[in-house]
Amino acid sequence: VLSPADKKNVKDCWEKIGGHGAEYGAEALERMFLSFPTTKTYFPHFDLSHGSAQVQGHGKKVADALANAAAHVDDLPGALSALSDLHAHKLRVDPVNFKLLSHCLLVTLAAHHPAEFTPAVHASLDKFLASVSTVLTSKYR
C-alpha cells in the first residue's frame, strides 16, 4: 500500500521526468531486452536495435501509461483497466515481465536522476511499480 509520502514521491518524480518520459521508457525497454533476452519474444515484429522507432514508440506508450498511473495513483485499477485487459487477454504477456521492466525503469531513473533517487524515493517508486504490475496482472485470474 502506498503511503501519502510514497504518493508524493511518485508524483514528484514524474514531474521531474517531464518531457523525458518517452526517452526513459525506450531506454528501460532496451535495458530489458539486453538484460533479459527472453522478453524479446513479445516483440517479434519490432526492430529491436538501439534507437529504433518501434522501441521509441513503445517506450512512449510505457511512459504515458505510467504518467497516467501516477496522476491517478489513488485509483490504479480504474486508470489501468484497459491496459490490464490488453496485456492479459490479447497480448498474453507473462506477468514476470512487468517485474523485469520495473527493475529496468528503476535503473534508468537512478542513472538519470542520481541526486533525487534517494532510498526513500527508490522505495516509493518500487512500491508504485509493484502496484502497477499487480493491477496489470489482476485480469489474468
Curated annotation (Swiss-Prot):
Residues 1-141 form the Globin domain. Keywords: Acetylation, Heme, Iron, Metal-binding, Oxygen transport, Phosphoprotein, Transport. The modification Phosphothreonine is found at residues 108, 134, 137. GO terms for biological process: hydrogen peroxide catabolic process. One of its GO terms (cellular component) is haptoglobin-hemoglobin complex. The modification Phosphotyrosine is found at residue 24. The modification N6-succinyllysine is found at residues 7, 11, 16, 40. Red blood cells. One of its GO terms (molecular function) is oxygen carrier activity. Heme b binds at residue 87. It comes from the Eukaryota. The modification Phosphoserine is found at residues 3, 35, 49, 102, 124, 131, 138. PROSITE patterns: GLOBIN. O2 binds at residue 58. Gene3D superfamilies: Globins. The modification N6-acetyllysine is found at residue 16. Belongs to the globin family. Involved in oxygen transport from the lung to the various peripheral tissues. Heterotetramer of two alpha chains and two beta chains. This is Hemoglobin subunit alpha. The lineage of its organism: Eukaryota, Metazoa, Chordata, Craniata, Vertebrata. The gene is HBA.
